[in-house]
UniProtKB/Swiss-Prot annotation:
Secretion signal span: 1-22
UniProt family annotation: Belongs to the conotoxin O1 superfamily.
Protein name as it appears in the record: Conotoxin 1
Disulfide bridge positions per record: 49-62, 56-67, 61-77
Keyword Disulfide bond annotated: yes
Places the protein is found: Secreted
InterPro entries named in the record: Conotoxin (IPR004214)
Keyword Disulfide bond among UniProt keywords: yes
Keywords linked to the UniProt accession: Disulfide bond, Knottin, Secreted, Signal, Toxin
Gene Ontology cellular-component annotations: extracellular region
Organism: Conus vexillum (Flag cone)
Tissue: Expressed by the venom duct.
Amino acid sequence: MKLTCVLIITVLFLTASQLITADYSRDQRQYRAVRLGDEMRTFKGARDCGEQGQGCYTRPCCPGLHCAAGATGGGSCQP
């Protein structure tokens, strides 16, 4: 009888802790996804223009920079 009560209490405790942990994890994952989306928007590779020193053969330079031709035929964004 005592063993049965201990097992029932243990199962209830573990179930409750699983439910609490699952609810907490769901909120954290949602926040992480939002943060990851913000990081992707500001990622250098996702920009539509070339930064200073980057090549300008396939995409235009960012505002305030112009494409300067290099000795090897390729250009780079310069102020």
